[in-house]
Design a protein with these regions (language model features):
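Residue-level signature of catalytic and energy-coupling elements of molecular machines
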Residues: 31, 61, 113, 140, ...
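Conserved phosphate-handling catalytic cores of large alpha/beta enzymes
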Residues: 119, 128, 132, 139-248
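Small-residue-rich helix-loop
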Residues: 279-293
Length: 305
């Protein structure tokens, strides 16, 4: 069963193509409310962190109130530069200005957050297709809400026909039934899933690995991803120092706070349990443990004060 699931999901994982002549242009498309703007920030943060590349974000959404400002705020919060907002510019003009700015300032990657559109809105679809062709995008990713069910699959088929997608970014996979939406998405839309959003934090974006998702669907956990998250979030030197302190029988409130902070960075106790075999089903029963942990994080500071 596991082998069949992997075959359905795709036997390999697909990486972003960022090897083109800078800047590599990544265009995010999708329906309204699918999470494109947040996903743009998550993707930019991930590329910056894992590939050590200089990333610029730009919003092409001139229709939704404060959409451009939202991306600017996310950029400021995560130390990612965004294109200066100039009012009354059309999406294509913004895209061309973003490309020119990215070239002049030597950015490696440009992420374009397009406006959310209705799949039956031909005018909006033509607009994004024109933008993609004019600026010669490197990657065209469709952002899809995995909770949308069959609608998500239909959306992927429609966008793939119009835009010739290079990949899919599934959001809210943490709320889905362990990733079941990914099954029909890959087989029906004929487009590889490249990333999955597994939470609300900017760090909660993972590369899509078919074998790991198959294990999650079958309730077998995903220990490899857990190890990778631990490697990303835990400072190796601090961990070694803490281990030496433990062996000497020393453990302070500050040490306790650091341990809880590390767990918090990795998604809390319930966030860790979903990666362990057989424990995903009980994680919802201990959600309150996260709240307790966050409260305890303030104890050392409160005690000192």
């Amino acid at each position: 069963v596991n082998d069949e699931l992997i075959e359905i999901l795709g036997s390999e994982n697909y990486e972003l193509n960022l090897k083109s002549k800078p800047p590599a242009i990544v265009l995010l498309a999708g329906l309204q409310g699918s999470g494109k703007t947040t996903s743009a920030a998550k993707l930019a943060k991930r590329i910056t962190k894992t590939s050590n590349k200089k990333v610029l974000m730009a919003s092409l959404d001139v229709y939704r109130p404060a959409a451009q400002e939202q991306l600017e705020v996310l950029g400021n919060q995560n130390q990612i530069q965004t294109l200066e907002i100039i009012k009354n510019q059309k999406p294509l003009e913004i895209a061309e200005r973003a490309v020119n700015f990215a070239k002049s300032e030597f950015f490696d990657v440009l992420i374009l957050d397009s406006a959310g559109r209705n799949q039956v809105d031909d005018k909006m679809m033509k607009e994004i297709v024109t933008i993609s062709k004019k600026i010669k995008t490197t990657e065209r990713l469709l952002v899809v809400d995995s909770m949308a069910g069959q609608d998500a699959v239909n959306t992927a088929k429609h966008f793939n026909t119009a835009l010739d997608l290079t990949g899919i970014l599934l959001t809210r996979v943490d709320g889905d039934s362990r990733g079941g939406a990914a099954l029909s998405m890959k087989s029906v839309a004929k487009c590889p899933i490249k990333f999955i959003g597994v939470g609300e934090k900017v760090e909660d974006l993972e590369e899509f690995h078919p074998d790991r998702i198959a294990n999650r669907i079958l309730g077998m956990g995903d220990v490899v991803t857990l190890v990778e998250k631990a490697h990303e979030e835990i400072n190796e030197k601090e961990a070694e120092d803490l281990q030496k302190r433990f062996l000497k029988g020393k453990f302070t409130l500050n040490d306790y706070s650091k341990q809880l902070n590390q767990i918090s960075k990795m998604g809390g106790i319930s966030g860790l349990l979903k990666y362990l075999p057989g424990l995903n089903e009980i994680k919802n029963k201990i959600e309150e443990s996260n709240a307790v942990s966050y409260t305890h994080l303030t104890l050392p500071t409160t005690t000192i004060v």
